[in-house]
Regions:
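Thiamine diphosphate
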Residues: 1-161
Length: 161
């Protein structure tokens, strides 16, 4: 089975080697996948902790200053907890922020409903009305192509892994 998160990090690593403007911002998650990126690119990595509203606002500001931020966290944390910042700061300004949501449905059911999306397309239903936001829902085999395509564009994007 192909792992979408691992493919995402590998592809982002390839891009970060060539582009020092890439910065990966995580919300205190993903350590089994992002540790190598963090070690290889310490100046292009920020663990913002559980500050979803703040890290989305930071990403918007960084994008408007010429950086290429990728915000990575569990789906509810990058779509619901910071919806206002995503809407107002990222989408309305068409900021070049790539939002990476991981683990749909009830993958984290042992952590309660705050860590899950039910129904499975809840995130897409919430985001589909936002201006300038391109939504990608790739299969694991499509992740590399989607990351490369979204990198080449300057609009905000949501990639659901």
């Amino acid at each position: 089975m192909t792992n979408a998160r691992q493919i995402f990090v590998e592809t982002l690593t390839e891009l970060a080697v060539k582009d020092p403007r890439i910065i990966l911002i995580v919300g205190d998650v993903g350590f089994s996948y992002i540790e190598d990126f963090a070690k290889q690119f310490p100046k292009q990595f920020l663990n913002a902790g559980v500050t979803e509203q703040s890290f989305m606002g930071m990403a918007a500001g960084l994008a408007l200053a010429g950086w290429k931020p990728y915000v990575y966290s569990m789906i509810p944390f990058v779509t619901m907890r910071n919806y206002e910042q995503l809407r107002n700061d990222v989408c309305y300004h068409s900021a070049n922020v790539k939002v990476i949501g991981v683990q749909g449905s009830v993958h984290y059911k042992f952590l309660g409903f705050s860590h899950n999306i039910v129904p499975d397309d809840e995130d897409v239903k919430i985001l589909q009305h936002l201006p300038n936001l391109k939504i990608y829902i790739p299969t694991p085999e499509e992740v590399r192509q989607v990351v490369l395509e979204s990198y080449s564009q300057t609009n905000p994007a949501y990639i659901r892994l």
